[in-house]
Amino acid sequence: MKILYVEDNDDNVYMLKNRLSRAGFTVVIATNGAQGIAMANSEQPDLILMDLTLPDIDGEEATRRLKGDPATKHIPVLALTANAMSADRERAIAAGCDDFDTKPVDMPRLLEKIAALKIE
């Protein structure tokens, strides 16, 4: 399974990419929203992990664009953010995210969410 991880924080990228790779996933990285949109089109991943706070196009807007594009609208998007308020979750879901999780990442919970998105 190929996962596109859209994240601008190098420490988060290093940590989660390694953990997901050890769990058997192929992980490709985009460091901003525009790159994430482009890579979703070129890589056609099975799942996108989307940070919501990005330096150019934020994760909500990137998700809206991905879900509005026939070439990428089928790809599940799981939002990852340090913001744990219910309003943040509601905005992410309204933007088109299929699920939402908080950072720091709880790996067993994230793996359950990934599995659930691939079953649906």
Residue ranges: model-predicted function:
Residues P55, K73, M85:
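The feature encodes the CheY-like receiver
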Residues D51, T81:
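Active-site residues of response regulator receiver
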Residues Y14-R22:
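Charged docking surfaces used in two-component/phosphorelay signaling
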Residues E7, T31:
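Conserved acidic carboxylate
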Residues V105-I114:
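C-terminal output helix
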